[in-house]
Amino acid sequence: MACKNPKKFFPICNSPILRDGALKGKVALVTGGGTGIGKAIATTFAHLGASVAIAARRMEKLEQTAEEIMKTTGGICEPFRMDIKDPGMVSDTFDKIDKKFGKHPDILVNNAAGNFIMATERLSPNAHGTIIDIVLKGTMNVTTELGKRCIQSKTGASVTSITAAYARSGAPFIVPSAVSKAGVEIMTKSLATEWSKYGLRFNAVSPGPIPTKGAWGRLFSGEMGDVAEKMKELNPEGRSGTPEEVANLVAFISSDHMSFMNGVIIDLDGGQQHFNHGSHMGDFLHTWDQDTWGDVENVIRGRTGKEKP
């Protein structure tokens, strides 16, 4: 049973937990930094004094976000167009960041992702390949590019990847994402043991239900306006999390205060994974018939401009 009074017992506190200037002198790169959780992380970093680079494919949105962050925080935030699936573009972007800030990032947050809910038998090879290319291969591209530069320059860095509890538990209807995020978590643990000798550390944050327009817009069709409320009912604390709560945790992990934290996967989900096995909506989605799946497929097809998801 979910808590009936989350405002009293589990209040939301979105203000930064670290002191002002805690990340001063750091250069932070946040992939997928234009919206949602990535935007919240970038905003918190800027508030704490870091010089922030946000990267994604849509430059117009990035420019809007960077301007908003600088206006809100008085900090530094620069947008960079980068497709993490393209290793050459990733390398070029790191060159631009180095030129802009005088060094490569001290902090990397792998937040860029792709996902949608769909019955697995309806997925084309292109559909699951696209998710794997973004979430797993893209994250590897960015992480290894930073790692090589740190090793060459003999400088350290903190890398935090945003994953999900279903990377460990598995979950129906989001198989490509589960496979990819599982790979990211193994990458995190593996590089923590291999590259610590070079001054790099690697951790991951696994958020529970965090309603954002970008991520939830990819997952659910426009008709599912009750999803957020249903998520609250499925959480022991009786509420969803906020992007700012994730941002606070990521900032703390990325700071020098947590230099001994390495190779750790942290769940920030209000106890969600223990409440219903890490799959927030599995039982609900199993009730969908073929007509409903067809409607969802049409929504995804219209959003991507492709014939099949």
UniProtKB/Swiss-Prot annotation:
GO terms for molecular function: 2,4-dienoyl-CoA reductase (NADPH) activity. The active site is at Y166. GO terms for biological process: fatty acid beta-oxidation. Pfam families: adh_short_C2 (PF13561). NADP(+) binds at G32, G33, G34, T35, G36, I37, R57, D83, K181, P207, G208, P209, I210. It catalyses: a (2E,4E)-dienoyl-CoA + NADPH + H(+) = a 4,5-saturated-(3E)-enoyl-CoA + NADP(+); a (2E,4Z)-dienoyl-CoA + NADPH + H(+) = a 4,5-saturated-(3E)-enoyl-CoA + NADP(+). Belongs to the short-chain dehydrogenases/reductases (SDR) family. 2,4-dienoyl-CoA reductase subfamily. This is Probable 2,4-dienoyl-CoA reductase 3 [(3E)-enoyl-CoA-producing]. The gene is decr-1.3.
